[in-house]
């Protein structure tokens, strides 16, 4: 595995002459521990927060193609490795991409940086049902669109009418629900696409019923998930016909710990940073759990948490299976 030296100051100096018209914020050597909910990870070589969609499109058109681009959202379902992220990390801000606009009696135009709880609150205010499950999803809409995030038996795919995206060259795309090719925690859109917004649809509802559904979602999270810990949410996707937490528990991995990383005692499909975990600790724990579960029940767990960046040179976690 090739290791690239992180030098954001040098990269910024190299790119700045060509990026003079960019309005967004470019910052070198950003500590990703301040960005992710796990509070782990190395440096982002260059961190870009576009002012708006036009600014993002111009940036992508201008950025040389040999510079790698990594997209991050709110950071709730993200593990950044300790060696950092070479190239440019792009994070959409709520200021430029956090709108929730009701465009018809049943539809919202929603920016990709909108937090799930804000979308649920807007739907409550508009008395549109079908969005209450977002009250229990800690991330933003961009990640929900990419992962077909869901809770309480509803997935994002059930709400999508159209998705708006930019590709690596800054070209605009309008994607239908069929174009997204959704399946469980997956869409088949090219990895270099950046979702900027989506048109979502619900149904007219009753405010009291919607509020009750949101309260039920919140109570469930508080009761069974370690929401007050430094965690990335669900670690692994559910295997077919069984919950990931069950096969993890049956393999004896509840409470399993490596360094500062632990499988939660409260919900053993949640990894937590107990205080001083590194990205290495978390990923090593996850791969250990995958190996033990496979040895116990032949279920090969697939990561739900997104792992990005490079390992430190001397601390590489081999992937099981």
From Swiss-Prot:
Swiss-Prot/TrEMBL cofactor(s): FAD
GO molecular function: FAD binding; UDP-N-acetylmuramate dehydrogenase activity
Keyword Cell cycle: yes
Swiss-Prot/TrEMBL catalytic activity: UDP-N-acetyl-alpha-D-muramate + NADP(+) = UDP-N-acetyl-3-O-(1-carboxyvinyl)-alpha-D-glucosamine + NADPH + H(+)
Enzyme Commission designation: 1.3.1.98
Predominant localisation class: cytoplasm
Keyword field contains Cell membrane: no
Classification via Gene3D superfamilies: 3.30.465.10, UDP-N-acetylenolpyruvoylglucosamine reductase, C-terminal domain, Uridine Diphospho-n-acetylenolpyruvylglucosamine Reductase, domain 2
Pathway annotation: Cell wall biogenesis; peptidoglycan biosynthesis
Enzyme class label: oxidoreductase
InterPro entries xrefs: FAD-bd_PCMH, FAD-bd_PCMH-like_sf, FAD-bd_PCMH_sub1, FAD-bd_PCMH_sub2, MurB, MurB_C, MurB_C_sf, Oxid_FAD_bind_N
Domain FAD-binding PCMH-type, chain residue ranges per copy: 39-205
Purpose of the protein: Cell wall formation.
NCBIfam families with a match to the protein in the record: PRK13905.1
Family to which the UniProt record says this protein belongs: Belongs to the MurB family.
Name of the protein described by the UniProt record: UDP-N-acetylenolpyruvoylglucosamine reductase
Organism: Bartonella quintana (strain Toulouse) (Rochalimaea quintana)
